[in-house]
Amino acid sequence: MKFNDELILLLKARYPIIYINTIEEDRVEYIIRKHIKANLNRSIYSWDFVDGYTNNPNNEGFAKRNPLQALELIERLTSETPALFLLKDFNRFLTDISISRKLKNVSRILKLQPKTIIIIGSDFQIPKELQDLITVLQFNLPVENEITQELTRLVNSLNLTIDPSLFESLTRACQGLSLERIRRVLSKIIATHKTIDENSISILLSEKKQIISQTEILEYWSVNEKMGNIGGVDNLKDWLKKRKTSFTIQASNYGLPTPRGLLLIGIQGTGKSLTAKAIATEWQLPLLKLDVGRLFGGIVGESESRLRQMIDVAETLSPCILWIDEMDKAFSNNDSRGDSGTSNRVLATFISWLSEKTKPVFVVATANNVDLLPLEIIRKGRFDEIFFLDLPELEERKEIFKIHIQEFRPNSWKLFDYKKLAQLSESFSGAEIRQSIIEAMYQAFDQQREFTTDDICLALKQLIPLAQLENSQTLKLQSWASSGRIRLASSKRISIN
C-alpha cells in the first residue's frame, strides 16, 4: 500500500497518534498538505519546539519551547473541528513522564473526534508504555518514478537536453538520496559545470557514499575483485553464474523470484569476503557492507532503529549487494553483549525482512563458526543457498598460487613450480597462501633480488596455518559440512584427517 493511501486509511479509522519515521520532514509535510487535506478537508496545525505553532493565525507562536502546552492546545480545540496536528521532532519528548501521561489523556479524546496527532521524526524510539497508542509509518526515500519526476522537472526548468541513457544513469545514481539532497547536489553541479553530463554521475555517487557513511552502520565499498581471483569453489561459481542476470526485467518476465541471498560458512581465509566483493563486481551492483559492531552499539533502542535504517537505505539503493561479514558474531547464540533481548529483536526483524523482502537486495552473509549461528538463520528458506568453503585441495592450491603470483609478477609467473608449492601448503587457506608469497617477496626484496619458488617454500615452512592451530574446530566444521547439511562450494570431496 502506498504511503498516501495508508495514511488516509489510518486517519479515516481515527487512529489517535501516528508516528512518521523519516529524514524528509519537508517532503512529508508537502504530501500531507497536498493530498491528505484534499481528501479529508482537515485544518492543519504545525508545531516545532523553537517556533511553536505556525500556519494558523489564531495560534501563531503558541507553545514555543513548551511541548506540554502544545498538547494542551489540542485538548482545548472544539470537538467539531477536524484537524491534523503535525508535531515535529516530538519523539524527543516522549520519555518525559508529563508528556507521556498527557498523550495518554489526549488520545482518549482523539478517538472520539476527527483529530489526529502526527509526530514527524527520524529517531525511532517509542517508550514501551506508549507503543499501543502510537502507530508507526515508515516514509521511505524517493523511489525511481519520484526521482524521474524530479529530474524531469529540473531538466525542463533549465531547458537542458539529456540523452535517455544518461538520464537513466542519473536516476540510478540518485537512488538512496532524499529529494532535498538531489536538488542540492544537482544545483551545485549546474553552478559549477553549467550543465548535467557524465561527470555528474561521479559527483552524485560521491554524495551517496557520504550519505551511506552517515548511517554509521553501512559502508559503500568500491570493488574490482573478480571471480577469476578466487581459486577453486567451482560449485559456488557455477551457482552465481546462473544468477548473474537474476535482477533483470527478462528474469522477472520469465517468472523468476527475486533472489534473497547467500550464506557462506567456512574456515577463516577461504575466500568468503572475497566472494562478496567479486559478486558485486561481476553483477555490476553497488556493494554495501554492514558494520555489525556499530549495529549493536549506542543506547538502548538504537540497534532496532539502525537496522530499520539499514534496510531502508539498502532497499532504496536496490538492486545492490548487502554484505554482512562474520554474521556468527552479530547474532551469536552466546551473546556477550549482555542484552539478549535487543539481539533477539534485531534478529527477528532481520529474518522477517530477509524472508519477505521484495526489493532486489542480495544479501551475502559470512560466518566462521556454525555453532554460534541461531537455527533461525540456517533454516531452509532464509537464504537461497548455504555454501561451505573448505580448505583448498591440491589442485585448488595450485590455482590459488597461480592467481596471486600472476598478480604480483604478470610477466614471469610461469617460472614457478606450482606443484611443489601446492604439495608444501597442505592445510593452508587461500589467504595464508597469499601471505606466504608476500613473505617470500619481503625476503627477496631485502636481498635485492627476485623472489623464487624456494623463497615461498621457506615462507610456507615458517608459517603455521590456522587450521593446525585450531585443529579440533576445523575438524568439527568439516565433519558438520560433510554430513550433507550444507552445499559444498567445491566439487572436491572434503577430506577429514
Curated annotation (Swiss-Prot):
Keyword Plastid: yes
Any GO molecular function: ATP binding
Alphabetized InterPro entries for the sequence: AAA+_ATPase, AAA_domain_protein, ATPase_AAA_core, P-loop_NTPase
Subcellular location: Plastid, Chloroplast
Gene3D superfamilies in the cross-refs: 1.10.8.60, P-loop containing nucleotide triphosphate hydrolases
Residues that bind ATP: G266, I267, Q268, G269, T270, G271, K272, S273
Pfam families linked: AAA
Key words, A-Z: ATP-binding, Chloroplast, Nucleotide-binding, Plastid
GO annotations of cellular component type: chloroplast
Family: Belongs to the AAA ATPase family. Highly divergent.
Name used for this protein in its record: Uncharacterized AAA domain-containing protein ycf46
Provenance organism: Trieres chinensis (Marine centric diatom)
